[in-house]
UniProtKB/Swiss-Prot annotation:
Designated name of the protein: SPbeta prophage-derived uncharacterized protein YorT
Length: 39
């Protein structure tokens, strides 16, 4: 049971990291678009 909980929390953590990574990538892309327009 404890092992299952640990695995569950680990998979939740990696999902959260993946989501944050995706959001940051999207933000970076948008930011670069804006910078290109300003130049």
């Amino acid at each position: 049971m404890e092992r299952f909980i640990k695995r569950l929390s680990a998979s939740c953590e990696s999902t959260i990291h993946h989501k944050v990574y995706q959001i940051m990538n999207e933000a970076k892309t948008e930011f670069e678009k804006v910078l290109k327009k300003l130049k």
